[in-house]
């Protein structure tokens, strides 16, 4: 199983939100580049970065920070948030990003998504963020009328190989992942799944590993030290 430490960027800083609420932010590190270096030092093999400002604005607003992170670490970096054109995708790849996560665009601009998947294949990941089972977009500020299962099935038909699934109600809560929704997703599509939201303990990670989930994104649990990064990397190596 792949472990993805999370760095959420807002106004150039590393922050955590509670249940996706921008009004409930906590600054975890004023220097996201330093945070990325710390994660690499303690064994991270990959990083997951979200441009929160970009997700709301519809364009990358933390590109310079992302570029500095990519230059500072030697591990692959995947990035999401506000990526809604091929130009934006290409710009991220040009600064060293390994994989790009499309969210809002996957729901509202299928032509762009299809072109991106055709050009970049497995380098394009789709982020599906669910609120009460329905897909949320534009930085989680809007909730659509499409279920997360239906969108996942559409993504599979287009040729998307990996989905990041987030249950917004679990995000930043340390309440454990939404196993029920993940199991339903697994039964519905044959796509690699990266679980996000609520992971609080090594036991949570082991549970996801037992389900054959491809990867897990860990945020608050690392910052609040309810999960030790070195330990979780070692544990998942042995599984």
From Swiss-Prot:
Catalytic activity: 1-(5-phospho-beta-D-ribosyl)-5-[(5-phospho-beta-D-ribosylamino)methylideneamino]imidazole-4-carboxamide = 5-[(5-phospho-1-deoxy-D-ribulos-1-ylimino)methylamino]-1-(5-phospho-beta-D-ribosyl)imidazole-4-carboxamide
Keyword annotations of the record: Amino-acid biosynthesis, Cytoplasm, Histidine biosynthesis, Isomerase
Active site, per annotation: 8 (proton acceptor), 129 (proton donor)
Record InterPro entries: Aldolase_TIM, His_biosynth, HisA_bact_arch, Isoase_HisA-like, Isoase_HisA-like_bact, RibuloseP-bd_barrel
One GO BP: L-tryptophan biosynthetic process
HAMAP family to which the protein is assigned, alphabetical: HisA (MF_01014)
The protein's name: 1-(5-phosphoribosyl)-5-[(5-phosphoribosylamino)methylideneamino] imidazole-4-carboxamide isomerase
Gene label: hisA
